Curated annotation (Swiss-Prot):
Record's function text: AGC kinase which plays a role in TOR complex 1 (TORC1) signaling pathway which mediates temporal control of cell growth in response to nutrients. Required for phosphorylation of ribosomal protein S6 (rps601/rps602) at 'Ser-235' and 'Ser-236'.
Residue numbers of Phosphothreonine PTMs: T392, T415
Keywords on record: ATP-binding, Cytoplasm, Kinase, Nucleotide-binding, Phosphoprotein, Serine/threonine-protein kinase, Transferase
Name of the protein in its database record: Serine/threonine-protein kinase psk1
Classification lineage: Eukaryota, Fungi, Dikarya, Ascomycota, Taphrinomycotina
GO molecular function ontology, one term from the record: ribosomal protein S6 kinase activity
Intrachain disulfide bonds: none
Organism: Schizosaccharomyces pombe (strain 972 / ATCC 24843)
The encoding gene: psk1
Post-translational modification: Phosphorylated by ksg1 and target of rapamycin complex 1 (TORC1), affecting the kinase activity of psk1 in a nutrient-dependent manner.
Class of this enzyme: transferase
Activity regulation (record text): Phosphorylation at Tyr-102 inactivates the enzyme.
Sequence positions bearing Phosphotyrosine: Y102
Family: Belongs to the protein kinase superfamily. AGC Ser/Thr protein kinase family. S6 kinase subfamily.
Catalytic activity: L-seryl-[protein] + ATP = O-phospho-L-seryl-[protein] + ADP + H(+); L-threonyl-[protein] + ATP = O-phospho-L-threonyl-[protein] + ADP + H(+)
């Protein structure tokens, strides 16, 4: 299964089990860019996105954009000066961790420090040819910069060359939670409680920042060297400005809340629906609403009750049913920080969780990844780690009339370097996998 999901569809991912799917730095203002051809004329312009205003799509539904002062502009402000820009040549590729329609993810070693990172590569041409590719890329880049949480994957650098964007992310040597689930088929309730508790803290943090995650599933839950959760892939995440509802028809179908499938306005409550699906999946080995076609899956999600197996305990059964309320206002967690979050934490399935210690990473994880050589990516699928490292040239013919790298304003300001304190202290304390 994929390590990082590059969503290649503007709407739903069509397959729940689909596989993810010159190095000189180029000055961001130094491109000779041409206009997009008519075939890509529907792409939202950067000027439409940067002011954070609401816009309507072709169906008349409202889209809410990430509030930013400019395309990919750092929240540090105009006075923020990166301590040292990176470029592809600064990193040695070691192995492939995942791939998709937008690009791929590599395990890389920073040449001057020896530190290991996950390098997410995104092909510019693929991004601009998708109607929402620019918006999703901007959202992911902006959110990753803003978020600081022990159970959310960190962004350390962002840069670009002529053909690609690069995100240098925290490497999670424990691999996907999905891989551990696939190996064991079903996870014990105490294990499920621990990891969904860590995910709950991550989601609460995002919701307090006004971010709706929208793609919670085992493939997007990684394990660090100690076995703690790292939530990753924010390509479908959205900042709902001033508490406004979202309307985009996105997500992974089996994990989508009814209100998304029915194209109704929705908010952070969709993430708690996905949490209920995730708990069911981890306990039983599959999501509750499955079928061999999209229409049947949609009918089950919007109309049917989950068929919970007899061996699921009463506590787990109760929280699943409370998360999977069709009416989002009745859903556990929907009340937000005042009541909803406390109600989740006080549920009996989490009775053994000390939430203060959990957030400080003081509770031992139930799964400790076997890591004999962090550079070998032992906990990732051999389907990807066996792939060649060579970068495939991007051909003009591959994208019709679109000239590669012909859209300067769209990617202006993408570069990012985390503060020295964050790079050194955070990395050494939480991600020193080479000493594991």
């Amino acid at each position: 299964m994929p390590v990082f999901m590059f969503d290649e569809h503007d709407n739903l991912n069509e397959n729940y089990n689909s596989h993810l799917s010159s190095d000189d730095e180029i000055a961001e203002e130094g491109y000779d860019f041409e206009e997009l051809e008519a075939s890509a004329s529907t792409i939202t312009s950067s000027s439409d996105l940067k002011d954070g205003k609401n816009a309507k799509d072709e169906k008349g539904t409202v889209e809410f954009k990430v509030a930013a002062h400019g395309d990919f502009i750092s929240s540090k402000g105009d006075n923020y000066v990166p301590s040292g820009k990176m470029r592809p040549a600064d990193f040695q590729p070691l192995t492939v961790l995942g791939r998709g329609s937008y690009g791929k993810v590599l395990l890389v070693k920073q040449k001057n420090t020896g530190r290991l990172f996950a390098q997410k590569q995104l092909k510019k041409a693929s991004i601009v040819l998708r109607a929402k590719g620019l918006e999703q890329t901007k959202n992911e880049r902006q959110i990753l910069e803003e978020v600081r949480h022990p159970f959310i994957c960190r962004l350390y650098y962002a840069f670009q060359d002529h053909d690609r964007l690069y995100l240098i992310l925290q490497y999670a040597p424990g691999g996907e939670l999905f891989s551990h689930l696939a190996e064991q088929r079903m996870l014990p309730e105490d294990v499920v409680a621990f990891y969904t508790a860590e995910l709950t803290l991550a989601l609460i943090h995002l919701h307090k920042l006004g971010i709706v995650y929208r793609d919670l599933k085992p493939e997007n839950c990684l394990l660090d060297a100690e076995g703690h959760i790292l939530l990753t892939d924010f390509g479908l995440s959205k900042v709902a400005e001033n508490g406004a509802d979202c309307r985009s028809f996105v997500g992974t179908e089996e994990y989508c809340a009814p209100e998304i499938l029915l194209e109704q306005p929705y908010d952070h409550a969709v993430d708690w629906w996905s949490m209920g699906i995730l708990i069911f999946d981890l306990l039983t080995g599959s999501p509750p609403f499955t079928a061999n076609n999209h229409k049947r899956i949609m009918e089950k999600i919007t109309r049917a009750k989950p068929n919970i197996p007899f061996y699921v305990t009463s506590d787990a059964r109760d929280i699943i049913n409370k998360f999977l309320k069709k009416n989002p206002k009745q859903r556990l967690g929907a009340d937000g920080p005042e009541k909803g979050y406390d109600a989740i934490k006080k549920h009996r399935i989490y009775r053994r969780i000390d939430w203060n210690k959990l957030e400080k990473r003081m509770l031992p994880p139930p799964i400790v990844p076997c890591i004999t050589n962090p550079e070998a990516a032992e906990n990732f699928s051999v389907e990807f780690t066996k792939l060649p490292l060579s970068t495939t040239p991007i051909l003009h013919e591959e994208f019709g009339n679109l000239t590669i790298g012909s859209h300067s304003s769209a990617f202006q300001g993408f570069t990012y370097v985390a503060s020295p304190n964050f790079l050194n202290c955070e990395f050494l304390s939480n991600n020193a996998v080479s000493n594991h």
